[in-house]
Amino acid sequence: MPQTPTLVAMFDSSSFHRNLYQSKEESCSELYYQDNNLLSGSLEALIQHLVPNVDYYPDRTYIFTFLLSSRLFIHPSELMARVCHVCMEQQRLNEPGLDKSQVRKIAPKILQLLTEWTETFPYDFRDERMMRNLKDTAHRITNGDEMYRKNVQQIIQNLIRKLASLTQYEELITKINAQSTDRMTVLKTKPQSIQRDIITVCSDPYTVAQQLTHIELERLSYIGPEEFVQAFVQKDPLDNNENCYSDRKKPRNLEAYVEWFNRLSYLVATEICMPVKKKHRARMIEFFIDVARECFNIGNFNSLMAIISGMNMSPVSRLKKTWAKVKTAKFDILEHQMDPSSNFYNYRTALRGAAQRSLTAHSNREKIVIPFCSLLIKDIYFLNEGCTSRLPNGHVNFEKFWELAKQVSEFMTWKQVECPFEKDRKILHYVLTAPIFSEDALYLASYESEGPENHIEKDRWKTLRSALLGRA
């Protein structure tokens, strides 16, 4: 069987624009083409363009792009209802005495569309209205046909499995977050319980980098493509409905992923500021430099940036006597790679290299590309803010959404990679649940290690000692 090309490969194809938008209604005044490329259209016409008929099936890239971007204008449940309505009207599936041979011609295409929707955007179906519409449409087109009925069962079973997996993951994250406590609180109540540090758990930086990659890939895998869009969904002035994402059931996996980045940064800073002796702090810094370097080699840019961010936090960077004992040449190279100047030019070059390696990879290890997530979110945000979603004539600016989908589709490919490294539960548990310092506690630990250098720092030190330790 020929392999179905990945979405990102289809988006990158030189023939993409030529093949993608061969419309079933080329003359439709509601869809605007230029050089055979669909640039804009009314929302209604774009919905029509999504619905297959006997002679037409929309391209995968159009399906992905429209399902991703349409939620800026219309809630997925309403879109599903309208797609179902158009489908019923077009094929007259509501009429009594329906010709079964007519249904057999269109049923596979409708089922294929439903399959693509449920596989790519499964979280849409947490909404009970979506699930009802899915089952209702599927019931109408199966029309007693055993083969189609089995296909529908398979679609729904796969969907339920994905949604159950999401629920389990959300419960796990909640449990992990509940176990992760404030280190200062633990120091006061059970100081003996946190005598360990990361090096006593695992002294091999390469293994730690691999375990960080496990966490990254697991958390990436649960992020739905729509989460990049729903983050900046606002009420459309031409739409009377409520905000498309006011629902309580919307996934928050992207938020959880950003929180993981922040946790890792604070864990790094905590581990460096905790040791009493200068040589132990210097050793910890060098350890994390090696972890960060291995993350870079793996293609794990998110953990790399989190580690660098932790080491650049003021409570850590002010430890001048400690840094004087550190061989910083490797750290300087890593900082150069992640330098934010020129819009992160060096990082973007390294990311392109990793993405190219992934395309020609012979192993899962070579396929790993974990982008610096906050920058990806920022890029998508500015793409959304920099281009209007509606044109003056009321048309949807589809040219913008093609660019949006191109960025998100690349992420979709990267998040599907299976981690090739063996899991070490002990390291994973420590990294995810070890108590960490708050920002104030980090400053206090830093001042306790290397005293204040000026009056401002002295005043802050006194305030923190009083507030956190109850000492003058």
Swiss-Prot record:
It comes from the Eukaryota. GO terms for molecular function: guanyl-nucleotide exchange factor activity. Gene3D superfamilies: Ras guanine-nucleotide exchange factors catalytic domain, Son of sevenless (SoS) protein Chain: S domain 1. Residues 34-164 form the N-terminal Ras-GEF domain. InterPro entries: Ras-like_GEF (IPR008937), Ras-like_Gua-exchang_fac_N (IPR000651), Ras_G-nucl-exch_fac_CS (IPR019804), Ras_GEF_dom_sf (IPR023578), RASGEF_cat_dom (IPR001895), RASGEF_cat_dom_sf (IPR036964). Keywords: Guanine-nucleotide releasing factor. Guanine nucleotide exchange factor (GEF) with specificity for rap2a and other Ras family proteins (in vitro). This is Ras-GEF domain-containing family member 1B. It comes from Xenopus tropicalis (Western clawed frog). The lineage of its organism: Eukaryota, Metazoa, Chordata, Craniata, Vertebrata. The gene is rasgef1b.
